[in-house]
């Protein structure tokens, strides 16, 4: 038993001793092979440089297209550089043309920026100029068409008078005969109906008189203050309060209205002093008062003058007329 144990110990020692010697010999052989060999074991590192060349070639071709747009035909030196670059993409001419291309692109960007700034400035100016005109076109009232004469308050203060348009000949309409014929026909029809149905004639006459009284109404004089965008900014609210103080607020004598389309000379006021043109004369036929004038550029100091000139001494009765019409 002791002999067999010692033999096994010797065999294991011999086997363990041989293993490191074998591995040491392999490592030495590998080291000798790597030390004596010249170059890399494979050519995979060259793929990086080949890929770089493939990427640079399309970029240079793209630059060539950009160079063709620079107008090189007019400059013989640049044209020669361009042909040289087409034949040899790695030549120094490419750097010169590249700088030319970058300068041209920077110049083009600057021109585009200037054009955008000019367009923006024009749009801003047109927006400021047309702010009032756009609102007036959408909010123009029907009373603007009834205005026959425009009064510039600057000329009015200087004593120049009223801007009178060219007279238009109008054929007189037979208003009264038509009304009389209609009333007479209605009266005859009512009498015939009474005779058939045995109705008293006095009751029918009372009905006809009451209907005619309801239709007839006196024209109301009033002052319309424009409340457009520019007129509001120019103090139309304060102007309306001043007119209410001078004229009175009973019966709606001073009212606000939509834009009249004259906002360039704001604030504006329209005086409705008559419905018929024949009523636009004073007590003296030699003094003509404009019918429904539109006063432009009105200030707070012009309120008394407008009331005295276009409404006359009867402006204190405007509220009474409006109240009678409302009832």
Swiss-Prot record:
Its main location: cytoplasm. GO terms for cellular component: cytoplasm. Expressed at low levels in stems, leaves, flowers, pods and seeds, and barely in roots. Residues 108-146 are annotated as: Disordered. SUPFAM superfamilies: Thioredoxin-like. Pathway: Glycerolipid metabolism; triacylglycerol biosynthesis. Residues 131-140 have a biased composition (Low complexity). The keyword Transferase applies. One of its GO terms (biological process) is lipid metabolic process. GO terms for molecular function: diacylglycerol O-acyltransferase activity; iron-sulfur cluster binding; metal ion binding. This is Diacylglycerol O-acyltransferase 3-1. It comes from Glycine max. The lineage of its organism: Eukaryota, Viridiplantae, Streptophyta, Embryophyta, Tracheophyta. The gene is DGAT3-1.
């Amino acid at each position: 038993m002791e002999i067999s144990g010692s033999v096994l110990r010797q065999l294991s020692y011999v086997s363990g001793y041989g293993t490191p010697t074998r591995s040491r010999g392999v490592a030495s052989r590998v080291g000798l092979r790597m030390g004596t060999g010249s170059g890399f074991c494979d050519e995979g590192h060259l793929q990086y440089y080949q890929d770089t060349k493939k990427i640079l070639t399309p970029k240079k071709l793209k630059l060539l297209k950009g160079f063709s747009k620079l107008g090189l035909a007019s400059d013989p030196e640049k044209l020669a550089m361009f042909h040289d670059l087409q034949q040899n993409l790695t030549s120094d001419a490419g750097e010169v043309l590249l700088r030319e291309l970058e300068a041209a692109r920077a110049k083009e960007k600057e021109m585009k920026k200037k054009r955008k700034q000019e367009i923006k400035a024009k749009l801003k100016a047109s927006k400021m100029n047309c702010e009032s005109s756009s609102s007036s076109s959408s909010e123009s009232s029907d009373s603007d068409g009834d205005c026959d004469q425009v009064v510039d308050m600057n000329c009015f203060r200087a004593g120049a008078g009223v801007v009178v348009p060219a007279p238009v000949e109008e054929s007189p309409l037979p208003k009264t005969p038509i009304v009389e014929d209609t009333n007479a026909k209605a009266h005859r029809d009512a009498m015939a109906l009474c005779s058939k149905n045995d109705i008293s004639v006095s009751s029918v006459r009372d009905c006809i008189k009451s209907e005619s009284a309801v239709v007839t109404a006196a024209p109301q004089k009033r002052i319309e203050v424009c409340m457009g965008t520019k007129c509001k900014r120019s103090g139309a609210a304060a102007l309306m309060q001043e007119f209410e103080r001078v004229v009175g607020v009973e019966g709606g004598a001073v009212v606000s209205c939509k834009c009249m389309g004259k906002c360039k000379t704001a604030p504006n006021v329209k005086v409705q002093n008559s419905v018929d043109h024949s009523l636009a004369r004073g007590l003296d036929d030699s003094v003509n008062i404009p019918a429904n004038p539109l006063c432009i550029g009105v200030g707070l100091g012009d309120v008394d003058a407008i009331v005295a000139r276009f409404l006359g001494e009867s402006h204190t009765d405007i509220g009474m007329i409006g109240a009678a019409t409302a009832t």
